[in-house]
Amino acid sequence: AEELVAEGKIGKVKQTMGTGPHRQGNYERPKWFYERESYGGIITDIGSHQIHQFLVFTNSNEANITHALVENTTKKQFPGFQDFGEINLTGNGGHGYIRLDWFTPDALPTWGDGRLFILGDKGFIEIRKYTDLAKSDTGNHLYYANNEEVKHIDCSDVKLPYFRNLINDVLNRTESACSQELTYLTMELAIKA
């Protein structure tokens, strides 16, 4: 997706919409999992990843949270637990909406149906990260449409440089995977939300 955006396939990015659904599971979780003071809440725990994607794809180095909400609807016996969250952001490169939840149904063959939608002024991209619902149990599906074409790309064999670069950054004290400024801004926004 980064390559397609950089090539201008969808024009200037206007908005991202990211989802971070997870499965609670039918097994015993450690006590800290339900204590906000320990895990930080659903927005810092899960939403930080979608905030990072928003900043990267909108090319924003400044952003504000315009709306944030968290709820606990399924585990009232654990008042610190949050099973739903949403965030609206406005950055100096675009807008974003993020939805997070612990509601993945048991029948889904993976732990969540994570998606990322990137809207540009000349097209859009949809990434189906972990499953292609009712079509394929595998993830890494990218769809895009612009004024010239509509395309599906199976990205399951695409090598992603991020983790290799991250390891290199740790070993060599470099910032090739992600700058410290971007990491700090991501977490600042997650904490503020």
Question: Across the structure, where does each feature detected by a protein language model lie?
Answer:
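Short acidic, glycine-rich loop/turn motifs
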Residues: 89-93, 143-149
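Contiguous beta-strand/loop segments that form the cofactor/metal-binding neighborhood of enzyme cores
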Residues: 52-133, 163-174, 191
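C-terminal helix-rich "cap/oligomerization" subdomain common to oxidoreductases
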Residues: 149-150, 166-193
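Predominantly a Rossmann-like dinucleotide-binding segment in NAD(P)-dependent oxidoreductases
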Residues: 1-79
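Short, hydrophobic secondary-structure boundary micro-motifs
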Residues: 13, 66, 128, 152, ...
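Short polybasic amphipathic segments
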Residues: 116, 132-147
